[in-house]
Amino acid sequence: MNRLLFLFVCLISIASFGQNTYQIAILKYNGGGDWYANPTALPNLISFSNENIGTNIKKEPATVEVGSSDIFNYPFLHMTGHGNVVLNSSETENLRNYLLAGGFLHIDDNYGMDPYVRTEIKKVFPEIDLVELPTNHPIFHGKYEFKNGLPKIHKHDASPSQAFGIVIDGRLVLLYTYESDIGDGWEDAEVHNDSEQIRLKALQMGANILEYVFTN
């Protein structure tokens, strides 16, 4: 799919939220990090969102390599892991073009990814800094209200959960969730033995993210 057509499809999806069927994807990257972490997370978020906020997303997410032109087939990419991330120059250019053409990337640090992914984000957008999203950002006030911003799902340490973004011409093109482990909260209940309340909070915040992406 060429970039102009991709942008057109994104605009159609936004205009007909809940009417078109579309697919989102997990981003596969190099460097040794476990891009495949949390295998039940995205399917559970998709089911929750389809049932509760009116999305019409295909039940199973795709998997797409960061350097592939196939990323232009998906309006939303999800990236996670615990370790190293390395993007070569062609992958960096491909991801940059995707985001500039209307795509969206959500990166969730699964604890241990932070120093690596920040370096790679800077390679994609050397001229733009990650900015912390304030608690009054619309992404926290969609279908579900999070007046204190990004919820803390797993407490590995005492650091607060934070949401960072890359904003271009007023559009949030990349969301980086840090010290939250929100993706763990999307997983099947028995994976981490999270309480129903914690899982619901994670899924509701995830639904807000999808709602924001497809309606803004």
Which residues fall in each region the model found?
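Sec-dependent N-terminal signal peptides
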Residues: L4-A15
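Aromatic-Pro/Gly-enriched surface loop or interdomain linker
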Residues: G18-F76, T80-G83, V173, E179-I182, ...
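An acidic, glycine-rich "communication" segment
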Residues: Y22-Q23, K28-G32, T40-A41, D114-E190, ...
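Short alpha-beta junction capping motif
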Residues: I24, F76-P115
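Surface-exposed patches in mature extracellular/periplasmic domains of secreted proteins
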Residues: N56-V64, I107-N110, I128-T135
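Alpha-helical scaffolding within the catalytic cores
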Residues: K59-V66, G83, N88-E93, A158-Q162
